[in-house]
């Protein structure tokens, strides 16, 4: 099946990261106007510079946990490009204090890091859905893609905070899909992807030894 996305407007939160950057590139290469959002200005600038030769792309500094920041981004995009057709929520991550080492139990987990991880991964998905989803509700069409995780489906890793947050993302996605279709328009779709492990900046040292071999954690 061939999809023609040329001229559509997409937002990719966390676009400075590995996953978000890959998705943003694919969209740009298919003729989509892409707004990359990230709280890290250096990562944002680097990604825009990487992709601008492939098509129309802009970078918008944005905090996915700050509603005012998200609303300002929405109004800018609507003023410049007229619509918001696609939202891909890839902003997220983990923290050492919310990850259990082999010699630790759940009682060693830092509750502060647990709270930060659940806030970023769950609310950092919910808030953009509410802000940019409003534009889709108003225009009667759009597609939201959230990033869940295989860790939300089974307790397969030592990442309790991340797993809890991604479980929340999964059920919120299902709920929002019904809400949008029943109360606004069936042309508004909300789905989630559940990737497995892949190497990124946040987990490279945990999964790969300095000599390039796999760590004990990555072999489990």
PLM regions: where:
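Canonical Rossmann dinucleotide-binding motif of NAD(H)/NADP(H)-dependent dehydrogenases/reductases
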Residues: 3-35
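Conserved glycine-rich Rossmann-like NAD(P)H-binding loop of the short-chain dehydrogenase/reductase
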Residues: 32-47
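A glycine/serine/threonine-rich, flexible loop-to-helix segment
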Residues: 102, 183-184, 197-220
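Amphipathic alpha-helical dimer-interface segment in Rossmann-like NAD(P)H-dependent oxidoreductases
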Residues: 75, 116-138, 177-182
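Residue(s) in the substrate-gating loop at a strand-loop-helix junction
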Residues: 149
């Amino acid at each position: 099946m061939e999809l023609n996305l040329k001229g559509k407007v997409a937002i990719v939160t966390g676009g400075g990261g590995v996953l978000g950057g890959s998705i943003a590139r694919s969209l740009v290469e298919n003729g989509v106007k892409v707004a990359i959002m990230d709280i890290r200005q250096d990562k944002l600038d680097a990604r825009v510079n990487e992709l601008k030769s492939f098509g129309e792309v802009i970078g918008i500094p944005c905090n996915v946990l700050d509603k005012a920041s998200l609303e300002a981004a929405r109004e800018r995009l609507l003023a410049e490009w007229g619509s918001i057709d696609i939202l891909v929520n890839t902003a997220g991550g983990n923290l050492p204090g919310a990850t259990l080492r082999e010699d630790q139990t759940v009682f060693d987990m830092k509750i502060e890091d647990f709270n930060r991880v659940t806030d970023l991964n769950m609310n950092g998905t919910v808030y953009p859905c509410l802000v940019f989803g409003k534009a889709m509700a108003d225009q009667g069409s759009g597609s939201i893609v959230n990033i869940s995780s295989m860790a939300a489906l089974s307790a397969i890793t030592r990442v309790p905070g991340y797993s809890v947050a991604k479980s929340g993302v999964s059920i919120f996605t299902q709920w929002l899909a019904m809400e949008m279709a029943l109360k606004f328009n069936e042309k508004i779709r909300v789905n989630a992807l559940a990737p497995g492990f892949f190497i990124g900046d946040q987990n490279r040292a945990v999964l790969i030894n300095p000599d390039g071999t796999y760590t004990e954690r990555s072999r489990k």
